Amino acid sequence: MRRQIMVDTQIRPSDVTKFPVIDAFLSIPREKFVPDGKREAAYIGENFQIGQSRVILDPRTLAKLLEALDVQKDELVLDIGTGLGYSSAVISLIAEVVIAVEDDSSLASEAEEILSEIGADNVVVQLGKLEDGAPEHGPYDIIILQGGVEEIPGSILKQLKNGGR
């Protein structure tokens, strides 16, 4: 019920119309990716702080990003700075495979546990430096950076397929 309300009040009014994106948000239990003390507020339209430098993006922003990227079922996606894995979980229902890179070992471990619990078996969580990405799994159709950067590192851009986004 709360997921439906989130979609109806935050995502659809933001001109997100692609069924795979909407269906993914309806299917993934956001509350599992929110810190214990904040689970009651999991579906409000805010970012959640999950570490010193990590947030779980608010549903509207993530949905608009995925709508703009036009993720396809046969695509390989690199999700850099996955945190607890919510974005990777949502993307996993739209793309073929998601490689989720996280540099915080406790967040990476918890993400693996949650993703396994919900059956997101097409997500691989990799512990490593964010600026390195995961070149061994690329090239990628789509690369998503969770957070702001002044300049995208060349090492990341080299992992993008020709024509990728």
Label each PLM-derived region with a short phrase.
Residues 70-165:
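Conserved nucleotide-cofactor-binding alpha/beta core module
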